[in-house]
């Protein structure tokens, strides 16, 4: 019993004595105050040069841009959908001697192509969970965020 009380006393002594004398010492060397001040000055300088995202584009300007984009896309509904084929008259140069890229035909064709691209399955399904390639793999395997939306 005597050795047990001595061992117990020794461990109690170490438990109370060591925390006061042993501190956390980092493995790396300590950073001096001048280095910290230089780093802080550098960060302040960078913050002055880089504008905050909210200041760059106020929410009001963003809503105006989305309204303009919506108006531009709503005008696309007037154009018939692009089937992916070119008319024989466009291929041959037109019946009236017009080239295949007459401005009116060209704009209608481009608008219908744009609408087809925007309405395609890949442009409709966007995910913030994965990147594009991983998202497609996830959709095919049944894993991932958009697996319930689109199946091949």
UniProtKB/Swiss-Prot annotation:
Cysteines engaged in disulfide bonds, as pairs: 129-145
GO CC, alphabetical: brush border; cell projection; cytoplasm; extracellular space; glycinergic synapse; mast cell granule; perikaryon; perinuclear region of cytoplasm
Family annotation (PROSITE patterns): NATRIURETIC_PEPTIDE (PS00263)
Spans annotated as Disordered: 54-104
Residues with site note (Cleavage): 122-123, 129-130
Distribution of this protein across tissues and organs: High levels of expression in the atria compared to the ventricles. Very low levels of expression detected in extracardiac tissues such as the brain, hypothalamus, pituitary, lung and aorta.
Domain of life: Eukaryota
A molecular-function term among this protein's GO annotations: signaling receptor binding
UniProt signal peptide: 1-24
Keyword Isomerase assigned: no
Keywords associated with the record: Cell projection, Cleavage on pair of basic residues, Disulfide bond, Hormone, Phosphoprotein, Secreted, Signal, Vasoactive, Vasodilator
Region (Important for degradation of atrial natriuretic peptide by IDE), start-end ranges: 146-150
Entry similarity comment: Belongs to the natriuretic peptide family.
Name of the protein in its database record: Natriuretic peptides A
Source organism per UniProt: Rattus norvegicus (Rat)
